[in-house]
Amino acid sequence: MEHANPILLGNNSPQKFITIGEVMLRLTPPNYEKIRMASSFEASYGGSEANIALALANLGVDSTFFSVVPNNSLGKSAIRWLRCNDVHCTPMILSSKEETPSCRLGTYYLETGYGIRPSKVIYDRMHSALT
């Protein structure tokens, strides 16, 4: 994929990056609610390495993300999210229950800070497809 404004090396060749990590389902209560008070959550995807791949792709860098996700609708939706944001996902592995018995997508809960109250994150990634 060619981009209009690629980031170039010293020899004017375009940069290519691959990030390796875990894409995770992010659940956030709406309107700065605290998790303990929430009756609903907004779902999106994240994870440090996935976010870096997406940010680089948005800057016009040829970006590839490698991870293992469960072979179910959550894993496939995470891959679709990355691809819709111009991140290459060819090396992604869709894991079966035989390969990773729990076959889970890591999840984290983000309580968005408000005013002087800081944001809080709770991770639930034990036995996820990548770990």
Each model region followed by its residue ranges:
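Alpha-helix C-terminal capping segments
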Residues: 51-62, 84
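A short beta-strand-loop structural module common to alpha/beta enzyme folds
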Residues: 44-46, 64-69
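Positively charged, low-complexity intrinsically disordered leader regions
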Residues: 1-35, 40
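Short, flexible micro-motifs
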Residues: 24, 49-50, 78
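Glycine-rich, flexible loop/turn motifs
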Residues: 31-32, 37-41, 65, 88, ...
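A generic fold-level signal
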Residues: 12, 36, 47, 102-104
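Short catalytic helix/loop segments, enriched in acidic residues and glycine
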Residues: 34-54
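Conserved N-terminal subdomain of the carbohydrate kinase-like
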Residues: 66-131
